[in-house]
Amino acid sequence: MSDSTHKIAVIGAGSWGTALAALLARHGHPTVLWGRDAAMVDTIDRTHENARYLPGIALPDSLRATTDLQAAVADAAWILVVVPSHAFTETIRLIAPLRPACPGVAWATKGFEPGSGRFLHEVARDILGPSVPLAVVTGPSFAKEVTLGLPTAITVHGDDATFAQAVADAMHGPTFRAYTGDDMVGAELGGAMKNVLAVATGVADGMQLGLNARAGLITRGLNEMLRLAAAIGARPETLMGLAGLGDLVLTCTGDLSRNRRLGLALGRGQSLNDAIRQIGQVVESVQMADEVMRQAEHHGIELPISNAVRAVLHGEITPEAGLKELLARERKPEYPQTLFT
């Protein structure tokens, strides 16, 4: 853990934003958590509990919460954005004119920009300019487990090695390991695709197709990640690490995953709207399936599992029909010879 105790601003008071803010505060960093909901923010600041997203879990007394964005980012050494992907662009635009002189900006948002399919680091770079260090925080991590202090490993990929290391150092601690890398494309691709593939495994489990089917979907889903990664210039080892395989396994098997729970509900015959209403939080896969397939079509890559998820989410096919189509596909070599070259 770093000895530095510079102020850190965390933007976004959902479950993951709150968990990371609590982690940083416990590691001795003056941490301010910003949120839009005045009542929720006031409760966090007074009672040190996020009763909406992390009920019953005590937050550090030193953690402050505010709805004043300018006050949150003032004098911050760096800023951590933790909002849903659909709010990412707007949030970066809001903080851009308020930043102190060139602090780094990191984010734990996963996915692409909805509607354009752009990588989030491309969005941030366009808005913030060329001189601001950027980093993405990703990996297999449920907010509840992090807040409870259970062992977790994540990775921080950035375009500035010093900044990525500073973010990792601030997060690293006795039960939280933070690695570093410089493949932002691969790290963001893994974070986007795992949400879509988690729906597929959830559907299979909801239909009671067995553990063999779950393992097959996870493995072939990883294959889809690797093939798209190769096409867009990401490094395969990134997808074989925490940002890819690690996050994929967790999201496909852990019932704390909203995307897996969505798949479970669909596999049991619930409608999409009813399933989302029951989950009660943002489910990234609904928009990400479109953006993943946008990337795949742009690069001429076939992603049968991801495409089946997209079709099910749009109501174009039933889960049963999607399964039948996947099982009827022409067999091919498991991996193209060029995948790892």
Swiss-Prot record:
Pathway given in the UniProt record: Membrane lipid metabolism; glycerophospholipid metabolism
Keyword set, alphabetical order: Cytoplasm, Lipid biosynthesis, Lipid metabolism, NAD, NADP, Nucleotide-binding, Oxidoreductase, Phospholipid biosynthesis, Phospholipid metabolism
Binding-site residues for sn-glycerol 3-phosphate, renumbered to this chain: 110, 139, 141, 194, 247, 257-259
The protein's Enzyme Commission number: 1.1.1.94
Binding site for NADPH: 15-16, 36, 110, 143, 258, 282, 284
PROSITE patterns per record: NAD_G3PDH
UniProt subcellular location: Cytoplasm
Catalytic center residues: 194
Catalytic activity reported: sn-glycerol 3-phosphate + NAD(+) = dihydroxyacetone phosphate + NADH + H(+); sn-glycerol 3-phosphate + NADP(+) = dihydroxyacetone phosphate + NADPH + H(+)
A cellular component annotation (GO) from this entry: cytosol
Predominant location: cytoplasm
Alphabetical GO biological process terms: carbohydrate metabolic process; glycerol-3-phosphate biosynthetic process; glycerol-3-phosphate catabolic process; glycerophospholipid biosynthetic process
Organism domain of life: Bacteria
GO molecular function, one term: NAD binding
Record-linked Gene3D superfamilies: N-(1-d-carboxylethyl)-l-norvaline Dehydrogenase, domain 2, NAD(P)-binding Rossmann-like Domain
Assigned protein family: Belongs to the NAD-dependent glycerol-3-phosphate dehydrogenase family.
Role played: Catalyzes the reduction of the glycolytic intermediate dihydroxyacetone phosphate (DHAP) to sn-glycerol 3-phosphate (G3P), the key precursor for phospholipid synthesis.
Full protein name: Glycerol-3-phosphate dehydrogenase [NAD(P)+]
